[in-house]
């Protein structure tokens, strides 16, 4: 297949089958492209869509985003995971407001300097947001290239090789359609396992398909590593319709999110209660549950304590009494949200 035929084949497939109605593809602009690309990092499209729609409705532009508190951004991000992305969005919004007057720069050199934006994301912003020539190398495109050219994934220079490859085949014209087509072929056809080669527009010249190597090629090297496990005790302190939460600081997991007081040892909970002169009305020990992070597996043991009166007062920067009936706009980790939902259901059934 010649280079020209290769382009025409991909663009023709995109015309008939490519995705063109995703929320960030409608009335697209650099801001929408940026937000969607950050959300799509390590997260599937179907998961991102509802989060993206809520986010854009609340923060329709750079100004509204940069003028809002970080807590409101983390609130809409709650449940999406990888919260560093949200914190980087906030940092970038501030930079764009202060340095670029709220206008997204169309220079690769400027975009690549912004927090949380790497080479491929910068390329996506330029290609999809500005309709400029720029290469993209996300996980989907990597998979297509590795299979199409039958690239050895054990090559220690594979990243450089893939960039060199995509740079050599990305056309100057209709770059955005070409990029989106490769992404879609990777996402819809050239799957991690059980690729749908029978409907792939590139199968007639795909080296892996022709050499029957499809199931020997993965886009990631197989790395065997043991994910550490940690046990946490969560103290759920409730007074009427309020629950006590602490803001996590800059160390460890869930930075800047609000969480129940956490303990490594169960005995530390008693010490905490005594230290804060907490008057206990009732204690409920909830079932342990597992929560997986990318680098850690947590075994969470919630202890739910009903108290007679508040002995700890809110400090807006560090602690709050979370209103179950009228929740504050703050970021919450998924395990905290799950527990709060259970408590609200329990309270509703026992009113």
From Swiss-Prot:
Its cofactor is [4Fe-4S] cluster. Binds 1 [4Fe-4S] cluster. The cluster does not appear to play a role in catalysis, but is probably involved in the proper positioning of the enzyme along the DNA strand. [4Fe-4S] cluster binds at residues 190, 197, 200, 206. SUPFAM superfamilies: DNA-glycosylase, Nudix. It comes from the Bacteria. The record marks 138 as: Transition state stabilizer. The active site is at 37 (proton donor/acceptor). It catalyses: Hydrolyzes free adenine bases from 7,8-dihydro-8-oxoguanine:adenine mismatched double-stranded DNA, leaving an apurinic site. The keyword DNA damage applies. InterPro entries: A/G_AdeGlyc_MutY, DNA_glycosylase, Endonuclease-III-like_CS2, Endonuclease3_FeS-loop_motif, Endouclease-III_FeS-bd_BS, HhH-GPD_domain, HhH_base_excis_C, HhH_motif. GO terms for molecular function: 4 iron, 4 sulfur cluster binding; 8-oxo-7,8-dihydroguanine DNA N-glycosylase activity; adenine/guanine mispair binding; metal ion binding; oxidized purine DNA binding; purine-specific mismatch base pair DNA N-glycosylase activity. Its EC number is 3.2.2.31. One of its GO terms (biological process) is base-excision repair. Keywords: 4Fe-4S, DNA damage, DNA repair, Glycosidase, Hydrolase, Iron, Iron-sulfur, Metal-binding. It is an enzyme of class 3 (hydrolase). Adenine glycosylase active on G-A mispairs. MutY also corrects error-prone DNA synthesis past GO lesions which are due to the oxidatively damaged form of guanine: 7,8-dihydro-8-oxoguanine (8-oxo-dGTP). Monomer. Belongs to the Nth/MutY family. NCBIfam families: mutY (TIGR01084). This is Adenine DNA glycosylase. It comes from Buchnera aphidicola subsp. Baizongia pistaciae (strain Bp). The gene is mutY.
């Amino acid at each position: 297949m010649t280079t020209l035929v290769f382009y025409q084949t991909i663009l023709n497939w995109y015309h008939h089958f490519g995705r063109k109605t995703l929320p960030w593809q409608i009335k697209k602009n650099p801001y929408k492209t940026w937000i969607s690309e950050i959300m799509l990092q390590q997260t599937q499209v179907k998961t991102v869509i509802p989060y993206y729609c809520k986010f854009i409705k609340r923060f329709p532009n750079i100004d509204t985003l940069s003028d809002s508190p970080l807590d409101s951004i983390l609130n809409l991000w709650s449940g999406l995971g990888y919260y560093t992305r949200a914190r980087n969005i906030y940092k970038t919004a501030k930079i764009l407001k202060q340095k670029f007057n709220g206008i997204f720069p169309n220079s690769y050199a400027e975009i690549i300097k912004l927090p949380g934006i790497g080479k491929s994301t910068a390329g996506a912003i330029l290609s999809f947001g500005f309709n400029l020539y720029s290469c993209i190398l996300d996980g989907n495109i990597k998979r297509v290239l590795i299979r199409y050219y039958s690239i050895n994934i054990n090559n220690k220079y594979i990243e450089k090789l893939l960039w060199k490859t995509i740079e050599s085949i990305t056309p100057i014209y209709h770059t955005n359609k070409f990029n989106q087509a490769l992404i879609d072929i990777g996402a819809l056809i050239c799957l991690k396992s059980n690729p749908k080669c029978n409907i792939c527009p590139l199968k007639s010249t795909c080296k892996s398909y022709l050499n029957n190597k499809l199931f020997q090629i993965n886009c990631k090297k197989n790395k065997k590593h043991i994910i550490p496990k940690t046990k946490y005790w969560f103290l759920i302190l409730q007074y009427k319709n309020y629950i006590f939460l602490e803001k996590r600081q800059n160390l460890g997991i869930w930075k800047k999110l609000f969480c129940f007081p956490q303990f490594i040892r169960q005995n530390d909970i008693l010490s905490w209660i005594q230290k804060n002169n907490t008057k206990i009305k009732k204690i409920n020990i909830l079932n342990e549950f597992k929560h997986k992070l990318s680098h850690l597996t947590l075994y969470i043991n919630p202890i739910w304590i009903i108290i007679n009166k508040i002995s700890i007062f809110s400090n807006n920067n560090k602690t709050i009494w979370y209103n179950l009936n009228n929740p504050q706009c703050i970021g919450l980790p998924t395990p905290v949200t799950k527990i709060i939902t259970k408590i609200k259901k329990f309270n509703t059934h026992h009113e």
